[in-house]
Amino acid sequence: MSLSQKEIIERVRAIAEPIVTSMGLELFDVKYRIQAGKWVLSIIIDKLDDYVSTRDCELVSYEIEKVLDSHDFIPGRYYLEVSSPGLDRPLKKIEDFRRFVGKLVKVKTKKTYRGYIVDVNMETKEIILRVDNENITIKYDDVKSANLEIEL
């Protein structure tokens, strides 16, 4: 029986999470999609206190590939890609906002804001941004998307 795309992602996540965590890294995301006519399994990793290195990606790829090959539940050929979220990474959890206090972000709610994270109130789930010399409070539940902005 063939698994759906969603089921493959869930299984890969269950396999990858403990491997990545044991290496002192965080599993940021798993994607399984067609790219340029070929299936690509993307595992995105992060490091809480530093940047992800090429070596980190190589080690994670090696370890996960061994386990995926032994389980063999992904049909056909696919490419395994391990990478970091990048400089303009999405902010998916409220903890991400707290981690990047002081950084420039773009936050989409009903409106789009571009400013610096001043503070995050974990109890009220509110994010305070400094936009054009003014502090703006945004409820985390109102955030549709957010990402770090690259400062030049």
UniProtKB/Swiss-Prot annotation:
**Biological process terms in GO annotation:** ribosomal small subunit assembly; translation
- Alphabetically ordered keywords of this record: Cytoplasm, Ribosome biogenesis
Where is it located? Cytoplasm
Q: Which GO terms describe its cellular component?
A: cytosol
Q: Which domain of life is it from?
A: Bacteria
Classification via InterPro entries: Ribosome_maturation_RimP, RimP_C, RimP_C_sf, RimP_N, RimP_N_sf
Q: Principal place where this protein is found?
A: cytoplasm
Give a short account of what the protein does.
Required for maturation of 30S ribosomal subunits.
Q: Which family does it belong to?
A: Belongs to the RimP family.
Write down what this protein is called. Ribosome maturation factor RimP
Gene symbol of the encoding locus: rimP
